[in-house]
């Protein structure tokens, strides 16, 4: 963030500071000192210097989170519940303040969740306890000697105890009637797993959410025939959450890409789970103008075929988001009525592990309009959609490398033997949404406008 130049007269800087504090514009001061005015504008995030993102609410027609009362987050907070936080400790204290009283929490600079109460950084060795050691863990549960049973015994117990110590630092709960917003263009929360668990009316905007890194992945042999490393943390997990608006966030593994992790027991030693997972009866969610990047499993909506309590819930709108260099789940859906419009998908030239974008699973009802995909030559339109126990997909206006395609027809023509044909009738038509642009227009606008630091 640019700062007011040192030559700015003290009185002008003071006037600006007071104006910002009061949430008022100070046109005289800015006219006298344009450079300082630009700095002040960025301090409130956005080009309009009078704009206070914390006080903004979701527009009346903007997706599922606008239904049934809408989403206001902490916009109604009194002055005692407006916080600017710069450390994990300050963030957690602000989130805890006043129970469900509306609150606005502004994140300034970079906050690392992997820090102790005095703000000192913690690494994986600081959490390890009871003799946990990766080399010993690998020796204990090597499938060639341990076999296919779930890990148990001293090393697994030590892993669990160590993982609990990390969870205590990085799992951060966000309660009802909260707005969490980044100040300026470079507000970062790294290492955290934000959890909106059983809460209602939450807004998260203008934030970089990075690297929810699991120090202690667990080996899970033979899960449905496939053994794999399982990791604990999503950057953002909505669990039984209602009325949530996620807007202009950038979520990624930045700092620790999984493709640089070793292969252990024949599998990538994954460190990250989802970027944004929406599960356990969550409902009425809008995700807009956000960027999901450089990651394996981006977004899971519904986490189990047997979670029939999700029936009639998991209603989500995804619009004007960028999914760039993600391997799968953009999103993968069970049960929900999910409106996917005007999103931009980019698979880079060097992506050799791409799996699919839209996952159509049990009782899902995805209504997709005017989305744009850009992929390298070895990826075909038939690769974009994958179904497991899914039966419907509505899609229109899809653009694939600049050409219109009908992904439903292509899926049914080229699906593998294990997938059944999908029908176009998803049983609903979205009513709450803004203007639906052409895929070409959306692709262009999202490339320029999605993600943290880009609210205009
Ligand atoms: Ca997850």
Predicted regions and their residues:
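Acidic Gly/Asp/Thr-rich repetitive segments characteristic of extracellular carbohydrate-active
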Residues: 61-106
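Extracellular beta-rich repeat passengers
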Residues: 332-456
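Extracellular beta-strand-rich solenoid/capping regions of secreted or surface-exposed proteins
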Residues: 93-100, 115-179, 187-205, 211-222, ...
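Acidic glycine-/aspartate-rich tracts in secreted/extracellular proteins
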Residues: 89, 110-113, 185-186, 378
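Secretory targeting and sorting signals
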Residues: 1-37
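N-terminal low-complexity, Pro/Thr/Ser-rich intrinsically disordered segments
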Residues: 39-77
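Right-handed parallel beta-helix
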Residues: 176-186, 200-213, 234, 240-257, ...
């Amino acid at each position: 963030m640019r700062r007011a130049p040192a030559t700015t007269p003290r009185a002008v800087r003071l006037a600006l500071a007071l104006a910002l504090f009061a949430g008022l514009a100070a046109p005289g001061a800015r006219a006298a000192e344009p450079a300082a005015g630009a700095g002040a504008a960025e301090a409130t995030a956005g080009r309009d210097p009078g704009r206070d993102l914390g006080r903004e609410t979701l527009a009346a027609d903007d997706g599922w989170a606008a239904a049934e009362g809408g989403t206001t987050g902490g916009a109604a907070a009194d002055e005692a519940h407006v916080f600017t936080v710069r450390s994990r400790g300050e963030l957690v204290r602000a989130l805890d303040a006043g129970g469900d009283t509306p609150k606005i929490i502004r994140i300034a600079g970079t906050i690392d969740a992997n820090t102790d109460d005095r703000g000192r950084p913690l690494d994986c060795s600081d959490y390890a306890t009871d003799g946990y050691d990766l080399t010993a863990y690998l020796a204990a549960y090597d499938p060639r000697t341990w076999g296919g049973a779930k890990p148990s015994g001293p090393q697994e117990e030590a892993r669990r105890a160590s993982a609990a110590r990390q969870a205590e630092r990085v799992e951060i709960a966000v309660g009802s009637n909260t707005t969490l917003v980044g100040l300026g263009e470079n507000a970062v929360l790294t290492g955290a797993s934000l959890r909106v668990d059983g809460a209602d009316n939450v807004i998260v905007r203008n934030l970089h959410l990075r690297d929810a890194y699991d120090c202690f992945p667990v080996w899970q042999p033979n899960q449905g025939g496939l053994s794999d490393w399982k990791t604990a943390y999503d950057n953002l997990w909505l669990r039984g959450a209602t009325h949530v608006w996620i807007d202009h966030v950038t979520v990624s593994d930045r700092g620790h890409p999984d493709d640089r992790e070793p292969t252990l027991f024949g599998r990538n030693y994954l460190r990250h789970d989802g970027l944004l997972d929406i599960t356990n009866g969550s409902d009425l969610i809008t995700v807009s103008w956000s960027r999901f990047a450089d990651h394996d499993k981006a977004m899971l909506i519904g986490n189990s075929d047997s979670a029939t309590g999700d029936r009639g819930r998991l209603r989500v709108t995804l619009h004007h988001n960028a999914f760039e260099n993600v391997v799968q789940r953009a999103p993968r859906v069970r049960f929900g009525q999910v409106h996917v419009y005007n999103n931009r998908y980019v698979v880079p030239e060097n992506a050799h592990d791409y799996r699919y974008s839209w996952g159509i699973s049990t009782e899902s009802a995805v209504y997709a309009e005017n989305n744009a995909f850009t992929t390298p030559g070895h990826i075909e339109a038939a690769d974009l959609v994958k179904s497991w126990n899914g039966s419907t997909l509505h899609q229109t206006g899809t653009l694939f490398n600049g050409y219109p395609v009908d992904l439903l027809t292509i899926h049914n023509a080229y699906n593998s033997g294990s997938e059944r044909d999908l029908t176009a009738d998803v049983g609903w038509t979205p009513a709450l949404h803004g203007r639906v642009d052409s895929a070409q227009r959306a692709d262009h606008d999202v490339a320029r406008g999605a993600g943290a630091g880009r609210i205009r």
